[in-house]
Amino acid sequence: MKKDAENENLLHAYEHDEQSSKYFIKPDSRYSIDDDISVKIDGKQLEVRKWPTLLATAMVGVGWLSNEVALAWVHERVPDDYHPLPDLFFSHFPEIRGAIRIAEYIMMILLISALLVMFTHQHRWIVIRRVFFCIAMAYSFRALCVTIFQVPVPSINTYCAPKSNSSLELVAGRVVKMFWSAGIEQLRPRELCGDLIVSGHTLTIFTAFLVFKTYAPQRLQPLSHIYHVLAFTALFSILLARKHYMIDIVLGYTVSTRIFMEYHALAASYHNRTFETNPLAWSFWSFFIPIFECDAPANMHNHLLLYNRSTSSKNVSTLKKSRRSFE
């Protein structure tokens, strides 16, 4: 024990030496952070601000509305005198029009599971704002892609409503008609075409899966393996139904997973006080991280605690002591 104490003192002196300090990453000092790891261990609920969660909710509404407006507008611009584009998946698998039902049933299962986890979580106000922000970013990017790039529909059997004009009244009427169906064809038969680039179904499916995998209790984690298989089954069904090209699915998967992972990586970096030195913080939206995370308990962002949940309370107290011994 005496030798360990001497080693700690030597390391502490080395870290604070002027010549050697340049080899260590200096923690951020711009933001105040609550490092009380005992908050979650003791099961106490932190007093968190509600307005960041309401802001994230408003951002979801704007992102979703922008998708509906984009679809209502680009329907007039979809090329209807071209055959479906060549696709590797379409070359090897036949079209099964009813397969979309499988994808949407799976999507509803994942979505309901994710919502239950979010709204019953101990830190629900923080979890909800994180998830909603990721959804808002993903769907805003999709709206941009849909607006700037239109391709022919993937199947000759796809029905598209007759084109009219792009007047404000027509676009507004289409938005009102589509808004509450949430893009689910079981709730509203598909009539408008054009929202192909970046699959909206894929964004929802994989964001819901990641929410469950990240925030579900340990006893429910075996379900995440089943949900992972179901998520890819849903993607396969979307392609069989010819609702999207394969590139739309790939883009949807990439956008949803990268945004979710990047946000949580930045949140962990923020609470580890390495936010300013993290290259991911170069993202134009990274300024939202301090706004959303400054009142979150720090132990929610520890990788071992948050994702693997393999660290016991005893290990947490040891981690807490060892971390503060070097400050």
From Swiss-Prot:
InterPro entries named among the record's database cross-references: Sphingomyelin_synth-like, Sphingomyelin_synth-like_dom
Listed GO MF terms: ceramide cholinephosphotransferase activity; sphingomyelin synthase activity
Enzyme Commission (EC) number: 2.7.8.-
Protein's UniProt keywords contain Zinc-finger: no
Record: active site: H201, H244, D248
Predominant place of localization: membrane
Keyword Repeat applies: no
GO biological process: ceramide biosynthetic process; sphingomyelin biosynthetic process
Pfam families, per the entry: PAP2_C
Top-level taxon of origin: Eukaryota
GO cellular component, one term: membrane
Locations listed in the record: Membrane
Keyword annotations: Lipid metabolism, Membrane, Sphingolipid metabolism, Transferase, Transmembrane, Transmembrane helix
Cytoplasmic side stretches: 241-327
Transmembrane residue ranges: 54-74, 99-119, 131-151, 192-212, 220-240
Membrane topology: Multi-pass membrane protein
Family according to the record: Belongs to the sphingomyelin synthase family.
Name this protein carries in UniProt: Sphingomyelin synthase-related 2
Organism expressing this protein natively: Caenorhabditis elegans
